[in-house]
Amino acid sequence: MQYYQPLLLTPGPTPVPEQILSAVQLPMVGHRSTDFEEIASEAFKGLKPVFGSKNEVLILTSSGTSVLEASMLNIANPDDHIVIIVSGAFGNRFKQIAQTYYNHVHVYDVNWGEAVIVDDFITYLKQLNVPVTAVFTQFCETSTGVIHPVHQLGHALKAFDNSLYFIVDGDRKSVV
């Protein structure tokens, strides 16, 4: 029997390297054991330089959507004002999650296939004239291939309101 392994270029699932497939065949370690605590501690320490963080790293064993939901629920309260930048399917998913839990969801629509224009977005925030707790966006809106200027946006948001949370669904290169 011949085994075919397709080349997957989607956001998930992705191909698993042979070394990891081999490691999966090792004996299981109990998640409440001392061995597991040591493995987890080593993993957390090893992830800090990968993400360029001095802060604690959290591992969530869930889908990307669950991580988006967890980030929202741990940043803002139900009566806070939050802003979602929607420029494709994943921004729309952020919006759907937000509308499930929050009373004051402000949606900043960007034409699908276009990146957010930082100055226009800051003008939008000023016109809202409400205390915004958090802004949510994506580094790369995978559904359209658009990369948002999150570094510039992060700096502009900090200048606008230093207490504002800026949550980016993306990789370590997109962190401000």
Task: Explain the meaning of each model-derived region.
Residues 1-33:
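N-terminal "arm"/small-domain region of PLP-dependent enzymes with the aminotransferase-like
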Residues 3, 10, 14, 42, ...:
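Conserved PLP-enzyme active-site core in the AAT-like
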Residues 23-70, 89, 93, 97-99:
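Conserved N-terminal alpha-helix of the aminotransferase class I/II PLP-enzyme fold
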